A protein has these predicted regions:
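Terminal, non-globular segments
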Residues: 1-156
Length: 156
């Protein structure tokens, strides 16, 4: 069952990443598609450290790199490092008390910090407010799609 849900989640993230090619935005919130990886990162962190999820996140990150014309490995690095930081945070905070939106808000904050550090380190232009709004829109959509991604160690 968990493998089927991993496959469905992978297809959803890969398909919504294709929406990067269309200039579709939600008003001031911008487009959530570049950080659609956040849904998988947050939902799949319930499995704990897992080679399958890390591999899927790596390849989804490469897929987003190709679609957004980013330097190859940028989104893969962001996805894997956000996933690792989310796992560590979930271990110390516990995800049960946070709920669906709380856990993705923590993951989104971690992703924002990693993206900021990565962009500053690379010395590239970085629209901070736009990135915050993009992550906020992905967090808002997670309320509707999160149940597809949420997995636990019991499902393995």
């Amino acid at each position: 069952m968990a493998r089927q849900r991993l496959l469905i989640g992978t297809i959803i993230v890969a398909a919504t990443s294709l929406l990067n090619l269309i200039p579709l935005e939600f008003g001031i919130l911008g487009s959530p598609w570049p950080v659609g990886l956040l849904w998988a990162i947050c939902g799949w962190s319930g499995l704990g450290p897992n080679l399958t999820t890390a591999t899927l996140l790596f390849f989804l990150g490469l897929w987003v790199d190709i679609l957004t014309a980013a330097t190859l490995g940028t989104w893969a690095f962001i996805a894997l490092s956000t996933h690792a930081a989310t796992l560590v945070t979930a271990q110390y905070l516990g995800t049960n008390g946070l709920g669906r939106i709380g856990s993705i808000a923590v993951s989104g904050t971690i992703m924002l910090l990693i993206m900021t550090v990565f962009q500053v380190w690379r010395g590239s232009n970085f629209f901070f407010v736009g990135t915050i709004l993009t992550i906020v829109s992905a967090i808002g959509l997670y309320h509707y799609v999160g149940f597809i991604f949420e997995l636990s160690e019991d499902e393995l």
